């Protein structure tokens, strides 16, 4: 998925699905899909099992970064599963830096599927580069957890080195190493060569400098399933799994939880990643009838499954749209929320 607000609404997943819908329908599975305030969110549920770890100082990244620190055993957030009145409450805002003084950005004033005022979010998923450590700290003071959105399978030239706080931008480092492949359809981004050691080093620097150093609790790794795309590099599913495991191990060594993103039409991919992954974020799995394909191993393991549905897909009134998927999500142990594809702060949660 490309970052919302960069020229196209929604996600890269939707475009992929529409092209392959007939194949998935033939398999009787439907099609898959591809991103201090006025309302203080309540403290997270005890089921989340979080043990705090201190922020890690950033280290400067050179064009050819040095060896990564050796992973060590550290505590990280283990978000519990979902269900009626259980589990974290989710806000996903990637359109712009989170404004903790904005009721919309903070997810306040939402109405749930039952037509009642929804409780405030306890988990915020925000852009790891655009948002400063002070925003993460402000959310922590409210008792909330914060997920760091980064791209691990593609790169866009969105940020300057100065905005990233490093001498040479991550995009420029990847370009200099020859690790940029074909364009991501519909977005100003290029796939990266996930089999290159230089790519791993740059992405690990991003995890360390943007997520760990700013005090985030977890990482949302976008485009973590590029084996299914035409990237310009030969990549097998097994190689993609190994890449994702390498990154999750590194994140854990820094005290960060790690999520799975995408891969919604490949249950084998989800099954392979679940043992080293702490939560799952799907997009449009209810709309495309693919939730069970990917969520089953996470639900069985008691891990959090988040389903982001989009008003652009369902096209009706919010209450009617929630009524079409929330009951199924909740009964399956999935935490569903309806967003606009711009991911600009509006949210309508199932519970």
Predicted regions and their residues:
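C-terminal motif of bacterial Sec signal peptides marking the signal peptidase cleavage site
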Residues: 25-28
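Glycan-processing catalytic domains of CAZymes
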Residues: 56, 64-351
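N-terminal hydrophobic targeting segments that direct proteins to the cell envelope
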Residues: 35-44
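N-terminal export and membrane-targeting signals
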Residues: 1-21
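Positively charged, low-complexity intrinsically disordered regions
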Residues: 4, 13-14, 35, 49, ...
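Extracellular/mature segments of secreted proteins
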Residues: 4, 37-38, 333-337
